[in-house]
């Protein structure tokens, strides 16, 4: 039998995801077998579980924190927005249906049963399960249909922590309002409050602590300091709104990323941020970097249409003529071909559209979705690297270019054990792949960065691998959480 703990929030981006990761790492370091859990997540950022199922990247990252293989049971229901108020619903890792909100709520009981199945599985196999809620736990217009917050605590008999972000202001009002809008049966599940992202002397909060406990009969059990040095993957595209430049601001290597309207799996870029200056560009911006990344997207045809509308397609060809390096990942890779065939409008309202015509390749969209972990040998001219990643794509591609990767496991372009395309036009290198996570492979990432440095006659660099940096930050987070929160009322 597992002990269940739940972290709910007063709002989105209050710190739930990071707090769950920190608690998972803290408990596993104490010798327990720990699992993260989020009953329902909405995100275009997803990864592949050990069962070859699709789960949100947040629960994948939390599994890393817990030092366990990521499972479909950590995120039984995943909603992937497609536009026009429609989401693709993923249940236990596999596509279920495309649904709007009204259709989804009519099948709420079905999803609840799947959530219960996962709770039962986790209860039997772990010592602790740390649950993450979604958004605000008290959207009073949605409470009857909310299967992502305190309903889950009720089902799992979990003790709940309410976290609020003081950096936004109004933290005590947010806590008080949330508690007093909750039904009594859910209010009783709250065992403590945690205040996140505090800067300064904690003494200034003590009067507030006393008053909020007096008003709610629930104590503040922790205050987490604001720490800008932590490097952890972001959960969804809301985190990159307004974000323009990040990474190593002193690096001589500049990477531009097209900020697609339906950008997905942008955590693919994280491994480069230690070595490179990273810059998002809009469709009407100039390309100023050494490397241009066309990232994953939920709607490749929509992005291709926007690139044409704002003239980015022409700028990309100019960039190639100047010797630029281009890297397309999944949906971004598809746009590099001659044509994207979407007769059933499965990608959006654009339909079939001509591509950038960099690769001699045709991509056709259908109903089948590749969801799998993949590995193989990546070959560039006389260089070879062992690489691994994961695939999440609905299109299949017929490419007449040199394959980038020979797969030993995976689907790739066409299910023929070849993935991606590679082309060199004079001093310009163009790479394309369906493999997300490919930049987590240190040797290939190092090759890509040093390709730019060699063009500039600069010394090669070799930083710590991404996995090592991530693990170090998980341990740092765990220490902060353990020192900041009194768990005596929870554990």
Swiss-Prot record:
InterPro entries: Class_I_gatase-like, CobQ/CobB/MinD/ParA_Nub-bd_dom, CobQ_GATase1, CobQ_N, CobQ_synth, GATase_3, P-loop_NTPase. Pathway: Cofactor biosynthesis; adenosylcobalamin biosynthesis. Keywords: Cobalamin biosynthesis, Glutamine amidotransferase. It holds the Pfam family CbiA. Residues 252-444 form the GATase cobBQ-type domain. One of its GO terms (biological process) is cobalamin biosynthetic process. One of its GO terms (molecular function) is ABC-type vitamin B12 transporter activity. Gene3D superfamilies: 3.40.50.880, P-loop containing nucleotide triphosphate hydrolases (3.40.50.300). Catalyzes amidations at positions B, D, E, and G on adenosylcobyrinic A,C-diamide. NH(2) groups are provided by glutamine, and one molecule of ATP is hydrogenolyzed for each amidation. This is Probable cobyric acid synthase.
């Amino acid at each position: 039998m597992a002990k269940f703990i739940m972290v709910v929030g007063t709002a989105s981006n209050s710190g739930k995801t990071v707090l769950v990761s920190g608690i998972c790492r803290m408990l596993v370091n104490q010798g327990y077998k720990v699992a993260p859990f989020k009953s329902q997540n909405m995100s275009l950022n997803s990864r592949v579980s050990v069962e070859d199922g699709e789960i949100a990247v947040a629960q994948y990252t939390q599994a890393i924190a817990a030092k366990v293989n990521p499972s479909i049971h950590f995120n039984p229901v995943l909603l992937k927005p497609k536009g026009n108020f429609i989401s693709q619903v993923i249940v236990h890792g596999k596509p279920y249906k495309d649904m709007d909100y009204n259709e989804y709520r009519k099948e709420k009981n079905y999803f609840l049963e799947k959530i219960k199945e996962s709770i039962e599985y986790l209860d039997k196999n772990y010592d602790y399960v740390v649950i993450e809620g979604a958004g605000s736990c008290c959207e009073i217009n949605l409470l009857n249909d909310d299967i992502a917050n305190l309903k889950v605590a009720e089902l799992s008999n979990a003790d709940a922590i309410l976290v609020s972000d003081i950096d936004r202001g109004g933290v005590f009002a947010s806590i008080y309002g949330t508690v007093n809008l909750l039904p009594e049966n859910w209010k009783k599940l709250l065992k403590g409050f945690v205040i996140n992202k505090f800067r300064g002397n904690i003494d200034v909060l003590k009067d507030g602590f006393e008053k909020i406990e007096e008003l709610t009969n629930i104590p503040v059990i922790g205050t987490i300091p604001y720490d800008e040095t932590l490097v952890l993957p972001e959960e969804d595209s809301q985190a990159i709104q307004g974000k323009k430049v990040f990474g190593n601001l002193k690096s001589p290597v500049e990477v531009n990323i097209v900020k697609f309207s339906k950008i997905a799996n942008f955590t693919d870029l994280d491994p480069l941020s230690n070595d490179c200056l990273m810059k998002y560009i809009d469709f009407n911006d100039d390309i100023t970097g050494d490397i241009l990344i066309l990232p994953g997207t939920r709607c490749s045809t929509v992005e291709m249409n926007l690139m044409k509308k704002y003239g980015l397609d022409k700028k990309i060809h100019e960039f190639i003529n100047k010797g630029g390096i281009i890297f397309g990942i999944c949906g971004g890779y598809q746009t590099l071909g001659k044509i994207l065939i979407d007769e059933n409008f499965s990608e959006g309202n654009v339909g079939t559209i001509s591509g950038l015509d960099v690769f001699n390749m045709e991509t056709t969209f259908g109903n089948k979705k590749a969801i799998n972990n993949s590995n193989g040998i990546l070959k560039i001219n006389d260089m070879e690297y062992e690489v691994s990643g994961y695939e999440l794509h609905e299109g299949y591609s017929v490419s007449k270019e040199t394959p980038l990767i020979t797969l030993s496991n995976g689907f790739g372009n066409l299910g023929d054990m070849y993935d991606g395309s590679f082309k060199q036009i004079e001093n310009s290198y163009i790479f394309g792949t369906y493999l997300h996570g490919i930049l987590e492979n240190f040797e290939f990432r190092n090759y890509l960065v040093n390709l730019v440095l060699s063009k500039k006659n600069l010394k090669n660099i070799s930083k710590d691998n991404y996995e090592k940096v991530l693990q170090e930050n998980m341990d740092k987070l765990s220490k902060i959480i353990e020192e900041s929160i009194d768990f005596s009322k929870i554990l």
